[in-house]
Amino acid sequence: MQKSHTKRLAVGALFCALVMAATLLAFPAPVVGNANLGDGVLLLGAWTLGGPFGAVAVALGAMLADLIGGYAAYAPGTLLIKLAMALTAILLDRLLRSFKLPRGFCHLVAGLTAEIVMILGYFLYEAFVLSYGPTVAAANIPFNALQGVLAILVSVSVYPLVERIGLCKRL
């Protein structure tokens, strides 16, 4: 069956918009920034779309949320951090599945690793690029970790539904 580039582009745009919306529905972090369910949608989109296209689509959604939500200073970092997260989730999932491991386990490990990338990425970005310093950046680590745990729970539990409707096979 030939893959439809139009359908893939449409689903990529949909996930971009969904990541943006889920990210904008946020609650403020105790020191700087915010936490949201955008990462859960980001992981879903990354695994559904796959490859560099999927990573770019979901990372753009997160960056657009920063621009719209008043966190423009975070936008460049978010683009790079979320791109690294998505690529980590996609590539590690693909690697683990090559060993014929259960998909849920692969997503759990890949999602956890991607969220560690997010936590480390935002710590470095806040501490050194935004010049908040390591102490202020470290204060957000528990909040980012909570966001990561929620993202893993959402993405790992919802992905079987995405798979069941056949969206992954049709792209």
Predicted feature locations:
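Loop-helix junctions at membrane interfaces
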Residues: 1-171
